[in-house]
Every structure is written in C-alpha cells, then in structure tokens.
Amino acid sequence: MRSLNTGKNLLHWLASVDEDGIAWLHLQTDGKSVNVLTHAVMAELGSLVDQLEASEDLTGVAMLSGKPGGFVYGADIHEFETLKTAGNVANHMLFVHGLFNRIEALPVPSCVGVDGIAVGGGLEIALVFDRLFVTSSPKTKLGFPEVNLGIMPGYGGSGRAYGRVGTKAVLDMMISGRPLGSQDAIKNGLADDIVDNADDLEVAMRQWLLGCKGEKPSLTQLETAADATEIAAARDKYLKRVRADHTPAPAAIIDHVENFGHDKSAMSAGEVGVFPNLMIGRASKNLRRVFYLTDAVRKSARGVSGIKRLHVVGAGVMGGDIAAVGAMAGLDVTLADMNEAAIEGAIARAKKLFERRLKSDDKVAAALARLRADFDGNDAADADLIIEAVAEKLDVKRAVFQKLETVSKAGAILATNTSAIPLEDIASVLKAPERLIGLHFFNPVPVLPLVEVIWSKYSDQDMVNRGMQFAGQIG
C-alpha cells in the first residue's frame, strides 16, 4: 500500500494505492462531525484527480467515507452564502462540474460505497462513479433534498440520476425531496449492488474492480427523451397548489428535465443555467433563513434535560398523543384525567400508534409498559415534568396548576400546552411562578414533530432550557 502523493498535506482525504493498483479515496472532512463538501474538500479532490490522471499503473478507483455512520451530507450550504451573485454561483458550479466530469472520464473502472446518509451533493459525487454500492442498513438514505431550500441539484446529479432511473423517478426524487432507502435505490436502478453492512463494502468493491480487469464499463441511458406523460403528470401533481413566484423550484425542475431529457450529460450541464437564479432568488433565501433558524433551535435543544418521568394531565386527543410520543421516546409516562374512559381510550390509541411506528412486538410491549393510567393523579409527585392539556379555560388551568404545585417536586417543571392564554395569567396564582413554562404541541402530535417552547416574565431560564432539551429529546 502506498500513498497517493499530491505534494500537499491533505486535511480532508486519505488516499492510497494498494498492491492491485486500486486507488482508495477516503473522505473525512476535517473539523466536521460528518462529511460535507466544502470548498477545501473540493480543492484537495482536484489535486487527487491530477494524480489519478497522471498515474499509468492504476487498475481502478474507489471512494468511501472515512467517518463511520454516514457517507456525505451534501455541500456546505453556509459556504454558498459567500457567493453573492448568479455569476459567482455559476463559476463555482463550473469548477465542480469540471472536477466531477474528470472523475467520470478516468480510463479505469471506478466505484463508490455508501453506508448511511448520501444526500444532495453527497449523492451527486456518488453518482460520478461507475458502480454504486450501498449497505442494507435502515440508516442508508439517498436523495435530493435541495427543493426544501428552494433549489435543485447543482453538481450534475440531475442528469446522472436521470440516466439511471428515468423521468418519473428523478422528478419524484427532486421535487418531493424524500430520500430513498437502499432497497428502493436498488429497485429503481439508482444503486447497483447491496451488501449487509459497512464492513462488507470494501470487499465487494475490490472484488468488482478486480473483475473488471482494468476495463471501464460502458454506461447506458435509461431513456432517450423525457417521458411526456410523466412530465404532464408531475405538473399536475406538484404545481397545482404552488405559486411559481413563491415556490419556483418545482416548476424549474420539471422544465429542466423536459428540456434535457435527450441527453443525461446535457441535463447535468444544464443545471448551470437554472441553479444560480434559484439560489439567489427570494424564495431560496427565505427557505435558507428558516433552515438556519430551525438549525439554531435544534442546537439549543441539545443536551441532557434530566427528564425521565413525564406526567400528563388531560387525556383528550392532545394530552393522550403527548403521552404516547413521550412513551415512544423512552420516558416513563403517567396519564391522568377525571374521566377514566378518556384515559383508557387514549391508551388504546397509543397502542395503535406504537404498532404502526415501532413494528416489533417487543418494542410495542415495552412502550405500553412505559405508559400507565393514573386515575387518582398521585403520580404527579414523582414526575420530572408535568404537562397540562385540559380545556382552554383560565380558571380550570389555574386550579390544575395550584394543585400540581403542592403535590409535585420542587424541581419539577410545570408546563401548559396552551396556545391562547398568556402564561402570566396562569402563573400569577402560583407561589413559584418561575416553574411554569409553555410547551405547545401541534396537532396531530405524532405527525408534526414541532414543539413551541414559551416562557413568561416569571419563567426560570433553567426550566426553559430543560423544556427545549425535552423537545429535542422526544423529537
């Protein structure tokens, strides 16, 4: 095994050539917990490609992640914010397109192994290689989520994916933004081979490369023109409920596939004429702003809440679903209500939810064991967090919290699910109003993983922080 000498110290790649002449490229983005395609990563890759092109004794090229549990999570979206004009964006794209085209054109066979997440630019770099191996892990996901930021694939992925899967599948991937699991990726042709786990990737890839005997395989294009029926179906499915001026990406994606369906390479190159204007447009800027804000909230929700026991007061739809989601997240949950039938109904609904989500009989049984009826309300005394989800009446909520304050632990968080009544109006009757925060769940709770954390002028900041950590804990 010898290193692939670029004449530079590589921070982001481990590159070597084995005794069979196979060049192994392992990406391990420096300073990041997961792999992302930063400008620095691309620059180093350019130096590596220079060496690959100059090497006369290679028999194949293989790429893997140097970080366990994931492949590549895409481009570094924060770096795109430094590209202020459409011209800046286009120039960056042309550099990456040129780099990826050079890898694709290497005269020896190439392959890539994906275990975990390969989305956005991560999938685009994977599609550059002749053969795509995936693991059967449920964590392996391949997709194009760019539409959620108001853009589309920009590193040639649209054409390369289209060549493999055709009009319908590539439109669904790019417009829905939903990733594919490994089995579905094999089924529709996006991926070529599947192995059990990450440890099997290198063995399978080596075997395939050796079998090629240095001969590059010829790759075909599934369709020679975009399917007009599928184009029309996509317009009907995806554009009926959106305004092009507010959400331009779906229409732009459909037009792009229709215009370049005759040639996958032209479709890849054609991204340079579409992506930059989407990137600098108002819709994408707004969606990226939401992404950054959401990411900041998620980061603030990290940490240990210290909450192990949850008590929910009110077994209606909201209260019952909050209790069920808590039990699914591994908390010990007690559910109280004046109406015993309401509690029993909530637990019956929870059982159906567990069966849909958890699948395994053992996991369903364990979740049900964590969710207990509390017909007399005594379990509030042991709870770390108490969430009230009773009728939206101020006097009712005040009475509930006055009682809870007397029976609960001093360090327990008192939380209301209200979205209509000011917290100060409830907290004003408490001896320790700083214990009260708002945890507003959105309905239906199991479907919408969103919790609004609210505080009053009285709320203790530590209680608020723990409430945010709890939201992250169950989400």
Model-based region annotation:
Residues 1-64, 98-101:
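Conserved CoA-thioester-binding segment of acyl-CoA-metabolizing enzymes
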Residues 1-28, 33, 124-128, 168, ...:
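Amphipathic alpha-helical segments at domain termini/boundaries
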Residues 29-32, 341-342, 355-414, 420-424, ...:
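Rossmann-like NAD(P)-binding element
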Residues 65-99, 118, 148-150:
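Glycine- (often His-adjacent) and acidic-residue-rich active-site loop
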Residues 97, 101-149, 153, 317:
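Glycine-rich beta-to-alpha active-site loop
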Residues 130-154, 191-205, 334-336, 340:
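Gly/Pro- and small hydrophobic-enriched strand-loop and loop-to-helix capping segments
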Residues 180-182, 331, 432, 453-475:
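Internal alpha-helical scaffold of NAD(P)-dependent oxidoreductase catalytic cores
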Residues 296-353:
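NAD(P)+-binding Rossmann beta1-loop-alpha1 motif at the extreme N-terminus of oxidoreductases
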